């Protein structure tokens, strides 16, 4: 019965390749460096996200009218959301050994963004790309091709779980011009 339910939920969606033990170790090691300056890195990620994809700001009334990256950087609301994003990633990284915990955290994120905030799920894919871009720029010395591959697999898994939550709640795409 559980297998049938899982098949229904994942129908039409290819599950990403699972992380190996080595890849989980790589992610945990590099994340320790990133998380040491999590607020600054998180702010950099969100600023890049909003500058390159200004349509994403529509979901944030507190700073949707901000155009200047310096103004965004000073926004306490943006900093608060950056901490939330980084803390969610931290929870995932800390629990890579426990796929059920990772899934439950990401399903909560997905459901909240679908129900409460009405965020188009494509923004999670876009944000994943921005995260990878910033990590490579800010931590280039340790962001080898092997590290990039590990993080890319993690971002694919995050997106898969989050969009799975959207599917689970019966998300209907709002418009094709949102992005």
Swiss-Prot record:
Disulphides: none
Assigned EC number: 1.14.12.-, 1.7.-.-, 1.11.1.-, 1.15.1.1
UniProt keyword annotations, A-Z: Cytoplasm, Heme, Iron, Metal-binding, Nucleus, Oxidoreductase
Catalysed reaction equations from the record: Fe(II)-heme b-[protein] + nitric oxide + O2 = Fe(III)-heme b-[protein] + nitrate; Fe(III)-heme b-[protein] + nitric oxide + H2O = Fe(II)-heme b-[protein] + nitrite + 2 H(+); 2 superoxide + 2 H(+) = H2O2 + O2; H2O2 + AH2 = A + 2 H2O
Pfam families named among the record's database cross-references: Globin
Domain Globin span(s) in chain numbering: 18-167
Binding site for heme b: 81, 113
Subcellular location(s) of the protein: Cytoplasm; Nucleus
GO BP field: nitric oxide catabolic process; oxygen transport; removal of superoxide radicals
GO molecular function, one term: oxidoreductase activity
GO cellular component labels: cytoplasm; nucleus
Residue ranges with Acidic residues bias: 1-11
Major localisation: cytoplasm
Residue numbers spanned by region Disordered: 1-20
PANTHER family the UniProt entry points to: CYTOGLOBIN, CYTOGLOBIN-1-RELATED
Biological function: Probable multifunctional globin with a hexacoordinated heme iron required for the catalysis of various reactions depending on redox condition of the cell as well as oxygen availability. Has a nitric oxide dioxygenase (NOD) activity and is most probably involved in cell-mediated and oxygen-dependent nitric oxide consumption. Under normoxic conditions functions as a nitric oxide dioxygenase (NOD) but under hypoxic conditions the globin may switch its function to that of a nitrite (NO2) reductase (NiR), generating nitric oxide.
Quaternary state and interactors: Monomeric.
Family stated for the protein in its record: Belongs to the globin family.
Name listed for the protein in its UniProt record: Cytoglobin-2
Record lineage: Eukaryota, Metazoa, Chordata, Craniata, Vertebrata
Gene: cygb2
């Amino acid at each position: 019965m559980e297998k049938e339910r899982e098949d229904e939920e994942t129908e039409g969606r290819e599950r990403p390749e699972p992380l190996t033990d080595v890849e989980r170790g790589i992610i945990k090691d590099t994340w320790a460096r990133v998380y040491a300056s999590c607020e600054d890195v998180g702010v950099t990620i969100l600023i890049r996200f909003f500058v390159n994809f200004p349509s994403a700001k529509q979901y944030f009334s507190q700073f949707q009218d901000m155009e200047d990256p310096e103004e965004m950087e000073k926004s306490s609301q943006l900093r608060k959301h950056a901490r939330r994003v980084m803390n969610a990633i931290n929870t995932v990284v800390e629990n890579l050994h426990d796929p059920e915990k990772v899934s439950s955290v990401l399903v909560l994120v997905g459901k909240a963004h679908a129900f409460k905030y009405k965020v188009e799920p494509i923004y999670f894919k876009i944000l994943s790309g921005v995260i990878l871009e910033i990590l490579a720029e800010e931590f280039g010395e340790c962001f080898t091709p092997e590290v990039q591959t590990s993080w890319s697999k993690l971002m694919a898994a995050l997106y898969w779980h989050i969009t799975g939550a959207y599917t689970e709640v019966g998300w209907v795409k709002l418009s094709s011009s949102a992005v």
